[in-house]
A protein has these predicted regions:
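C-terminal and inter-domain tail/linker signature
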Residues: 1-149
Length: 149
């Protein structure tokens, strides 16, 4: 895919995220696609799991915003960076909401296949998330995350 084609698909994906439209975000992904949260060591595969994960994220952070600051392109891969902002108003990986607002810098690596996003690997600092959201790392991991190995 060209950089322009990847950007068009990714922009549609980010727009769906910012509308908090889980189905539309999942629709930009390849049927064999995945979403991987590297910090928490979890991976979701296929449209159903991807949509469910986005729905859970948008429930936890109903004002979620993906503020993309830049992107770079390689052969069938896009790397995007920015800041995820939101207020924790619902459970997140089994942890009760804290009502606190977060602003977490991220880097996402997004491979493409057949004109769609094959996946999204999200990298961010887990300690920053826990500190800003008022979460204990142990509680977050007990709720479904696991440290990467």
């Amino acid at each position: 895919m060209t950089a322009a084609e990847m950007k068009q698909v990714h922009d549609a994906h980010v727009a769906a995220e910012n509308r908090r439209d889980a189905a539309a975000a999942a629709a930009t992904c390849h049927p064999e696609g995945f979403i991987e949260n590297v910090a928490l060591g979890v991976r979701f595969e296929g449209h159903a799991q991807i949509a469910a994960q986005y729905a859970a994220l948008f429930h936890a952070f109903p004002d979620a915003e993906m503020m993309q600051e830049g992107e770079a392109f390689g052969t069938d891969v896009l790397v995007a960076w920015g800041v995820f902002r939101g207020t924790m108003r619902g459970p997140f990986f089994g942890v009760a909401p804290t009502g606190r607002r977060i602003a977490i810098p991220f880097v996402n690596v997004v491979p493409f296949r057949d004109g769609l996003m094959l996946g999204e690997r999200a990298y961010f600092d887990l300690a920053t998330l826990c500190a800003q959201a008022g979460l204990a790392l142990e509680d977050l991991l007990a709720g479904g995350g696991s440290l990467p190995r």
